């Protein structure tokens, strides 16, 4: 796969994968994947194996693997941007789509391709400029993405009767357009809400995706751009069962185009249980700083954590539905902080909590996973570089998540996945079993 054109590389991979799956299903189509219990049906289908999702797999102990590669491996192997050594999200997207670590040339082709596709249609700009300032940034993001479907190659081609075997090509084009435009939409929302509507400026085709994004947001610190490269890489995908990934997969299965599928995913990400956790962590840390005035002694922190738990709340940023060890997405953010902001008081507090919280949660005995997740750290890093607008953080998460769910959406259409339609049951029906 030496070609720098991602579509050409994909076109060569798809027939092989179609054949592999066809053979596998012929031989093992009837194999049972496990038992489904009554509790699973009432419990949000936790642990139920019912989806095929190719781009990443979550190992309870290892954490996320993107096409088989762990986060430390991705940090080592993916092409880097600046002198800071963080991987470029373009490289991760190439990996998610192809299963192959890209070359520097392939990544710079993607950067240029996205820069070329980035311009927003004027009606979307007008719409964003007309939103009231009290409309949540995630609502603005979702609405703008939905309105972008005026540009949908897939919807147009479907209306013209395109062959099923060509669906993936149009989904690819729309996914590439959408990823290219997302930083412009996100930056416009940021400037309108927090920078008096100032201009996001123009895309520079010589810069990478993250660098253009931080420029448009109005940040000039090269370290912040490095953080953005890391952030957009590690938040990109987390298996197929989480709310945003599952939503895009479900809506996409109705052959709704990538804009509609991704907007639906963003409405899921806007939910407090999915995308708001890093905001909640910062709120909790701020309260903790106010309360534990005794210069952050371990004992007073322990007391504060116990008070949180005893009042029936959870410690935000700790625990995960699947993970059973420290989230590697937490670890790489911790390493970034140790390298770039070791003296920051908020980072010191987060690092101190890392030593204390797991022990308290183990003593309490209720948590299956007492270790920190990705959200325990990201807010502190963003704040350090001056991005203090917590309401906006989920928008960054959303821009990143596009890489994973749209890579999968291309494959879902390439592999001809059908409309998703599980069977539901009533309580009476379950009791009658």
UniProtKB/Swiss-Prot annotation:
SUPFAM superfamilies: Citrate synthase. Its EC number is 2.3.3.1. It is an enzyme of class 2 (transferase). It catalyses: oxaloacetate + acetyl-CoA + H2O = citrate + CoA + H(+). Pathway: Carbohydrate metabolism; tricarboxylic acid cycle; isocitrate from oxaloacetate: step 1/2. Keywords: Mitochondrion, Transferase, Tricarboxylic acid cycle. It comes from the Eukaryota. Citrate synthase is found in nearly all cells capable of oxidative metabolism. Belongs to the citrate synthase family. Key enzyme of the Krebs tricarboxylic acid cycle which catalyzes the synthesis of citrate from acetyl coenzyme A and oxaloacetate. This is Citrate synthase, mitochondrial. It comes from Gallus gallus (Chicken).
């Amino acid at each position: 796969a030496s070609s720098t054109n991602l579509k050409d590389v994909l076109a060569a991979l798809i027939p092989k994968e179609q054949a592999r799956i066809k053979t596998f299903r012929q031989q093992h189509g009837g194999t049972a994947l496990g038992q489904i219990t009554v509790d699973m049906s009432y419990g949000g289908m936790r642990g139920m194996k019912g989806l095929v999702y190719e781009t990443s797999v979550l190992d309870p102990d290892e954490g996320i693997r993107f096409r088989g590669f762990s986060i430390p491996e991705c940090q080592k192997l993916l092409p880097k941007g600046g002198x800071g050594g963080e991987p470029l999200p373009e490289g991760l997207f190439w990996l998610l789509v192809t299963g192959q670590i890209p070359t520097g040339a392939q990544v710079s082709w993607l950067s240029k391709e996205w820069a070329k596709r980035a311009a927003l249609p004027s009606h979307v700009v007008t719409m964003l400029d007309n939103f009231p300032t009290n409309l949540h940034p995630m609502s603005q993001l979702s609405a703008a993405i939905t309105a972008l479907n005026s540009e949908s190659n897939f919807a147009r081609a479907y209306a013209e009767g395109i062959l099923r075997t060509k669906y993936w090509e149009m989904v690819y084009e729309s996914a590439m357009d959408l990823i290219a435009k997302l930083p412009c939409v996100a930056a416009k929302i940021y400037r309108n809400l927090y920078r008096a509507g100032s201009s996001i400026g123009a895309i520079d085709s010589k810069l990478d995706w993250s660098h253009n994004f931080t420029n448009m947001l109005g940040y000039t610190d090269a370290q912040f751009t490095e953080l953005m490269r890391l952030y957009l890489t590690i938040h990109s995908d987390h298996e197929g069962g989480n709310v945003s990934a599952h939503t895009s997969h479900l809506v996409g299965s109705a052959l709704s185009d990538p804009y509609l599928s991704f907007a639906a995913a963003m409405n899921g990400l806007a939910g407090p249980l999915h995308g708001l956790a890093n905001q909640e962590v910062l709120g909790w840390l701020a309260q903790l700083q106010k309360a534990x005035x005794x210069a952050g002694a371990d004992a007073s922190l322990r007391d504060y954590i116990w008070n949180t738990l005893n009042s029936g709340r959870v410690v935000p940023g700790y625990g995960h539905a699947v993970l059973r060890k420290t989230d590697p997405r937490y670890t790489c953010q911790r390493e970034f902080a140790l390298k770039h902001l070791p003296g920051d008081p908020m980072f010191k507090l987060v690092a101190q909590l890392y030593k204390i919280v797991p022990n308290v949660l183990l003593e309490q005995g209720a948590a299956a996973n007492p270790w920190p997740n990705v959200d325990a750290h990201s807010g502190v890093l963003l704040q350090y570089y001056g991005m203090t607008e917590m309401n906006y953080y989920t928008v960054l998460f959303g821009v990143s998540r596009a890489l994973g769910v749209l890579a999968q959406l291309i494959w879902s259409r390439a592999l001809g996945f059908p409309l998703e339609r599980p069977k539901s049951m009533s309580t009476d029906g379950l009791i009658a079993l």
